[in-house]
């Protein structure tokens, strides 16, 4: 048997314009979005099929990628392609309102749901880590998480600093696909930020895409810049090459006091995503292949040091929170018993939004024309006229966010609003106002599509943190409702054994049939989030369910 190819020296970019390369827009859309995930402007390591988040891939290997492209190119509108951990395994006759693609990535029976077992399967070519939007083909670059991070910083500013972050600064680490959103989000929220990153290539990526403003030469230079900009009231983001497990303890030792502390290193994956203190990146990658157990141990020991420093900041009264990378869990496993003393960002700042089905609604212009996104921005403002916060976000996004690959936009909207926007976008395609169809999707990090006790479902008030029926129901309902492609993943964000989550994407191609599917999917999808939180007893969700007329049999 020929060994599967994990590396290919090639550049992939999605087709642009309104000329089809597949049989219809329902199959052209997943084809373009798969390719867009691997665009060198989008992906972290596209030649190895890695999109973001350590080893989050778009396809299992290059042979699988080629066959997915082949299958989508010839897929009919009454057929469905099944993808198992990045490998196309079957094409079946279904019907025109069924999904064109159904994806299951990284799922393991719970007893075996560990990194150790997954890595064995991955080495044998039997599995693929799909992260959240890598293996579900709806990653749009760091913009995909910018607004969620922005909303978090804004809410933290409201709670701790009277809604004013001017002259304040955020300390964090990690400038990968997810963490790369932090510096821009902090700037948009009005704060300075110091962003520690151990790879110069990641810093360069964020500098080139304008997600980070400057790079300091060393820690002293970084602190001098922070002092200058905070005194001047300027919101400037600063990158610093270094290891967080070394720099945070040094900051504690020096008595430096940030105004907010968080982290977005790839701590969820100690073998591939977190550089042990004192190691070079080349050493880390080489030893990961020859002595993985020792590498994992060293990475987790460094995480323990990192978390102890974060706890020290919290003890000083500095707002400190986990941003969903499972670093607290890793530190606790290394003996830091009080690792969970600082909260996760969802229970601390975001859950009230989830209770109303508000979450990361995103869309991409398959035309490749930025004007299509600017026109949809205007439509969002027209249809949601009274939300000044949303309008401000859209204005800032247009000014500051560079498109990566196919032009795309994200904004957090909820139940009722998503369907209204989707139907309007479909009408814009029908009328020719948009030059080609758009796709609408979301992160798996949403109100009803994830079970993750150390992140999205941390500290649920009824204790249902680990109940994972909800993302399964979300995926089933999106399939029944007619989403264009639906995905069900395990381990995204926080790593193997710690999460299950689902995603959906729907195509707006301007047809009546699309409008019917959009109305169902973009209502039902956020409605499951309201349902899930109402079931857990959150009054905000119960009130929203009643206002929106949801039929929840056990909610009176």
UniProtKB/Swiss-Prot annotation:
Pathway: Amino-acid degradation; L-histidine degradation into L-glutamate; N-formimidoyl-L-glutamate from L-histidine: step 2/3. Its EC number is 4.2.1.49. Binds 1 NAD(+) per subunit. One of its GO terms (biological process) is L-histidine catabolic process to glutamate and formate. Keywords: Cytoplasm, Histidine metabolism, Lyase, NAD. It comes from the Bacteria. One of its GO terms (cellular component) is cytoplasm. Its main location: cytoplasm. Disulfide bonds: none annotated. NAD(+) binds at residues 53-54, 131, 177-179, 197, 243-244, 264-268, 274-275, 323, 493. PROSITE patterns: UROCANASE. The active site is at residue 411. Transmembrane segments: none annotated. InterPro entries: Urocanase (IPR055351), Urocanase-like (IPR023637), Urocanase_C (IPR035401), Urocanase_central_sf (IPR038364), Urocanase_CS (IPR023636), Urocanase_N (IPR035400), Urocanase_Rossmann-like (IPR035085), Urocanase_sf (IPR036190). Its cofactor is NAD(+). Gene3D superfamilies: Urocanase like domains (3.40.50.10730), Urocanase superfamily (3.40.1770.10). Belongs to the urocanase family. This is Urocanate hydratase. The lineage of its organism: Bacteria, Pseudomonadati, Pseudomonadota, Gammaproteobacteria, Pseudomonadales.
């Amino acid at each position: 048997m020929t060994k599967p190819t994990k590396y290919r020296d090639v550049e992939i970019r999605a087709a642009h314009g309104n000329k089809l390369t597949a049989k219809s827009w329902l199959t052209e859309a997943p084809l373009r979005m798969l390719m867009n995930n691997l665009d060198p402007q989008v992906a972290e390591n596209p030649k190895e099929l890695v999109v973001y988040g350590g080893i989050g891939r778009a396809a299992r290997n290059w042979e699988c990628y080629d066959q997915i492209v082949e299958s989508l190119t010839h897929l009919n509108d009454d057929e469905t392609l099944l993808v198992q951990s990045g490998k196309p395994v079957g094409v079946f006759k279904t019907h025109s309102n069924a999904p064109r693609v159904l994806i299951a990535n990284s799922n393991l029976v719970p007893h075996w749901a560990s990194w150790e077992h997954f890595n064995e399967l991955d080495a044998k070519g039997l599995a693929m880590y799909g992260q959240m939007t890598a293996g579900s083909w709806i990653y749009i670059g760091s913009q995909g998480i910018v607004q969620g991070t922005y909303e978090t910083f804004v809410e933290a500013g409201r709670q701790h600093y009277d809604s004013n972050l001017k002259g304040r600064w955020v300390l964090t680490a990690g400038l990968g696909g997810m963490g790369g959103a932090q510096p821009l989000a902090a700037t948009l929220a009005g704060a300075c930020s110091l962003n520690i990153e151990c790879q110069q290539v990641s810093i360069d990526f964020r500098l080139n895409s304008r997600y980070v403003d400057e790079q300091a030469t060393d820690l002293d230079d970084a602190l001098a810049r922070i002092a200058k900009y905070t005194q001047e009231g300027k919101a400037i983001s600063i990158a610093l090459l270094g290891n967080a497990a070394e720099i945070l303890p040094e900051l504690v030792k020096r008595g430096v006091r940030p105004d907010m502390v968080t982290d977005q290193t790839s701590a969820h994956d100690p073998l591939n995503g977190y550089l042990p203190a004192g190691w070079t990146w080349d050493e880390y990658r080489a030893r990961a292949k020859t002595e993985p157990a020792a590498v994992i141990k060293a990475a987790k020991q460094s995480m323990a040091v990192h978390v102890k420093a974060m706890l020290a900041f919290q003890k000083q009264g500095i707002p400190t929170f986990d941003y969903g990378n499972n670093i607290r869990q890793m530190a606790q496993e290394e003996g830091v018993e009080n690792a969970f003393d600082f909260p996760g960002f969802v229970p601390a700042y975001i859950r009230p939004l989830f209770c109303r089905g508000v979450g990361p609604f995103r869309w991409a212009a398959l035309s490749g024309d930025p004007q299509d996104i600017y026109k949809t921005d205007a439509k969002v403002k027209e249809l949601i006229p009274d939300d000044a916060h949303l309008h401000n976000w859209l204005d800032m996004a247009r000014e500051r966010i560079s498109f990566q690959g196919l032009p795309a936009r994200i904004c957090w909207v909820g139940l009722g609003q998503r369907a209204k926007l989707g139907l309007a976008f479909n009408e814009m395609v029908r009328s020719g106002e948009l030059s080609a169809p758009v796709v609408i999707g979301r992160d798996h990090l949403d109100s009803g599509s994830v079970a993750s006790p150390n992140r999205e479902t941390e500290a649920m008030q009824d204790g249902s943190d680990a109940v994972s029926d909800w993302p399964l129901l979300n995926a089933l309902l999106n399939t029944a409702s007619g989403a264009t492609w639906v995905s069900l993943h395990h381990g995204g964000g926080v790593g193997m054994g710690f999460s299950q989550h689902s995603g959906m994407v729907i195509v707006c191609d301007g047809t009546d049939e699309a409008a019917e599917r959009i109305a169902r999917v973009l209502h039902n999808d956020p409605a499951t989030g309201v349902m899930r939180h109402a079931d857990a007893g959150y009054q905000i969700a119960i009130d929203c369910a009643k206002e929106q007329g949801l039929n929840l049999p056990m909610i009176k």
